[in-house]
Amino acid sequence: MAQISVTPEELKSQAQVYIQSKEEIDQAIQKVNSMNSTIAEEWKGQAFQAYLEQYNQLHQTVVQFENLLESVNQQLNKYADTVAERDAQDAQSFGF
């Protein structure tokens, strides 16, 4: 049987790191998108189009990573709730 030595509060705190990281990535993407819009006004031609094409492909990978971070956040929160429920059930089994 596994021994759980982490508290639900610790798990929820750790889960927050994942969602905060996702939010930081969102902010970085917004900055880059804004920069791309500015550059697009001045940089014309095939080189810029190639850059945008590559950026859009890589952007999809970043979005997948963001989804992963959000998923891990949800899983950690769900597990924290499960640990808390199990602990409460165990406490009730002693009849105090």
Curated annotation (Swiss-Prot):
The keyword Iron does not apply. This is Uncharacterized protein CA_C3713. Keywords: Coiled coil. Residues 9-86 form a coiled coil. Belongs to the WXG100 family. sagEsxA-like subfamily. The lineage of its organism: Bacteria, Bacillati, Bacillota, Clostridia, Eubacteriales. It comes from Clostridium acetobutylicum (strain ATCC 824 / DSM 792 / JCM 1419 / IAM 19013 / LMG 5710 / NBRC 13948 / NRRL B-527 / VKM B-1787 / 2291 / W).
